[in-house]
Amino acid sequence: MKDFGFVKTAAVCPRVTVGAADKNVDNMLPLIKGAASSGAQIIALPELCITGYTCSDLFSQDRLIESAEAALGRLILECADIGALVIVGLPVRVRGRLFNCAAAFQNGRLVGVVPKSYLPNYNEFYEKRHFVSGLDTPCDTVTLCGQEVPFGNMLFCAGNGAAVGIELCEDMWVPVSPGTVLALSGADIIVNISASDEMVTKNDFRLSLIEQTSARCYCGYVYSSAGIGESTTDLVFSGACTIAENGGILARNERFERNGAAVYACIDIKKLEALRRNSEFYDNAARYADRDIRRVDITLPELRESDIDRNFDAHPFVPSDEKVRRARCAEIFNIQAAGLAKRIEHIGLKKAVIGISGGLDSALALLVADKAFDLLALPKENIICITMPGFGTTKRTKSSAVTLTECIGAQLRDIDIVPACTQHMRDIGHDMSILDVTYENVQARERTQILMDTANKEGALLVGTGDLSELALGWCTYNADHMSMYGVNCSVPKTLVRYLVDFVADERGGKLGEVLREILATPVSPELLPPDKNGKIAQKTEDTLGPYEVHDFFLYHFQRFGASPDKLMFMACRAFDGVYSREQIEKWLRLFMKRFFSQQFKRSCIPDGPKVGSVSLSPRGDWRMPSDADASAWLDL
């Protein structure tokens, strides 16, 4: 059974009765068992939840401390058939000192006790009145519930590669938290059992801390805080439960629930490992990790595929929220335009050349050039747009190209490549009735020759139009549309190109908006093969390759996180459930892998262009791969 690197976690908050340890265990049991039956492998409950956090001076009473230990023993016994790592909070007396602790157990066995390092003693908090810090423990083991177990900071290491660290409440709020050290020492999941009271705006700040901690440490973060039933003498606790991963919230509950709460999320530790490898994380770990930290071996229950409750965005390059998407489009558009403006300014040119096809990519390139020329205060007629109709050009795309150029106010030139291509095929002895790769590439290279030579003649920069998806699949002709003097779309995937063009259509409106909408409605095609008998596009890229949205999904998870082919299959089937069949997705994944490997030689020599997002295939930056690597291992699904 494969878990694909996912670990299912639960943040649970039971209702408590202050000082009544047995009642509190009674309330915990159904929540813990429910979480376990849902497939949770790690279950976190709040700080001091066995007694209640708000016992105050009752913590000095032997009866409370003894009842807490007895209640923990009963809880462990009644959860003997649960293999999940369960983490609960209680006071523990060690050699006369009282510690605020997290006890971890599974399969009826206590496996470790972690004391709180940083005790808040300001404003409403007076923990030092009752507890001592875990930064200076008198021993490294403790006997609790009749079991001698490790005591102090430690990592709980599972056979599936997961490593879990624990911190308590205030530990997260200090400049260098125990969780940070635990992450640098190998923890990919940090559990924080907490008792954080509520005040106006505090929840937003707390969520921000959780997000930032999971982002800084490239970790999963499971947070469970005290809730209903805690004393309201001076404070109110909401039972906030949150699970985060790498800066994003995976799950959180509605606070102030009256009868306990539980949230679940699967944390992708393989993804986190990839992010750590591709950053300075391990360099920092070499300097700041605790090399002497204890590692406690645990075994987590197997995660059933049906219990992986994670959803995957079918369009990871495109924010689903419209407001965020528009802001993202504006930022990308500005990056592209600034990159092009700098290159034109540096060379000292005043003109640009663009091949306009009436398709999406060339439309976006022209819009970027339009913006760049605004930045440089250059006249728009210095943008030379060239349409080059060939054997497959349709009236629709030709009309769109002309109208778009006119709306921008750029200079328009029309050069029919049919005579030159016909002569060239005669010269090389190619039968024009054979509509093969030679037939197509003759046209592509003729167009690039025209564009390059025009740029030389005019003292202009040839702006490339190819996008990231085409680079990934090698869907371009080597030394033809593959080549330019600066590629503004080189790190923009096809799915995002559509939204960028749509964004400009909305922003600018009018006749420009209308023609951009027409282009958006046009099938993606290189138009290198003749149109059908009705004069419509016959050669449709997605009929050959499969949907770009699926290939962009593969690209995002493969390049950024190193997702394996079987994991890509699993994720894509979830993301496109009800849209494409498993058989279709498998066919397209094999095609993606074959082309990604076989077409690397094109990516090894691509022009400069601006990086706009987290995924890029520039051989000078994000992706350096041999052109003759074998794809066999990646075709084994």
Tell me the role of every PLM-derived stretch.
Residues M1-G355, K371-K380, L412:
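Enzyme catalytic cores with a strong preference for nitrogen-chemistry domains
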